[in-house]
């Protein structure tokens, strides 16, 4: 809806590439949701680690605690979470048989590496585990990533993959940079991404995309 409000047309990818939507019609072209039992499995790991957790359906999200971090997230993203405190999110997901597109943990930046590694160890063989910011650890379907989204869009528009360009700033962008003909890590990118991708000498605040 927000892309439509801006007058944009074409396709938009979300939830780490597991959902691709036609902006004008709202039609889902790709919908790689997690079945309720798999989403609950992820939630139980997050619950064991006592993490601030969000679970996302297609158009809303549920969260296990109301705190300052959630208020800031809601303000920045202009969204409103459904706070669930009467039962674990794993129980809610199973009870409602929710189709979950993403499970996310909000963490302190200084704890991100440790928590990411713990989640990766527990879930990495079965699910796609990544992080998208200094304080966000995310888990989605292993079958999808921003890389699969780039390949889908290139095929959809009839553009050879070697003629595509992608730019990113965090680890969740790596599959996209690897899939594209030219993949660039902007100047302010996470060091883990810079180590694995070609660097570009401008930050996002310096209009890096416009200068490619």
Predicted feature locations:
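Short, intrinsically disordered, charge-balanced linker/junction segments flanking boundaries
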Residues: 1, 89-90, 210-212
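Alpha-helical substrate-recognition element adjacent to the catalytic core
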Residues: 1-32, 36-37
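Short, hinge-like loop/turn segments at secondary-structure boundaries
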Residues: 4-10, 29-32, 69-74, 146-148, ...
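Conserved acidic, metal-coordinating active-site core of Asp-based
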Residues: 39-41, 45, 49-167
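Short amphipathic alpha-helical segments
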Residues: 2-4, 25, 67, 116-118, ...
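Mg2+-dependent phosphoryl-transfer enzymes with acidic/Ser/Thr/Gly-rich catalytic loops
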Residues: 138-212
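Short, structured coil segments at secondary-structure junctions
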Residues: 6-8, 16, 24, 123-125, ...
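Short secondary-structure capping/turn micro-motifs that flank functional sites
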Residues: 19, 62-63, 170, 193
């Amino acid at each position: 809806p927000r892309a439509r409000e801006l007058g944009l047309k074409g396709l938009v990818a979300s939830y780490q590439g597991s959902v691709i939507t036609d902006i004008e019609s709202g039609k889902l072209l790709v919908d790689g949701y997690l079945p309720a039992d798999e989403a609950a499995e992820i939630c139980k790991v997050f619950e064991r680690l006592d993490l601030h957790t969000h679970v996302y359906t297609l158009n809303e999200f549920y969260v296990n605690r109301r705190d300052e971090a959630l208020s800031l997230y809601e303000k920045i993203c202009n969204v409103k979470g459904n706070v669930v405190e009467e039962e674990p999110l794993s129980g809610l997901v199973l009870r409602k048989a929710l189709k979950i597109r993403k499970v996310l943990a909000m963490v302190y930046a200084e704890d991100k590496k440790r928590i990411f590694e713990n989640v990766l160890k527990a879930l990495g063989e079965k699910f796609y585990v990544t992080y998208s910011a200094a304080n966000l650890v995310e888990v989605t379907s292993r079958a999808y990533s921003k890389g699969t989204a780039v390949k889908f869009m290139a095929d959809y528009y009839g553009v050879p993959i070697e003629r595509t360009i992608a730019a990113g700033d965090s680890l969740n962008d790596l599959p996209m940079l690897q899939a594209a003909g030219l993949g660039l890590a902007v100047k302010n990118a996470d060091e883990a991404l810079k180590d694995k991708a070609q660097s570009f000498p401008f930050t996002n605040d310096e209009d890096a995309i416009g200068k490619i």
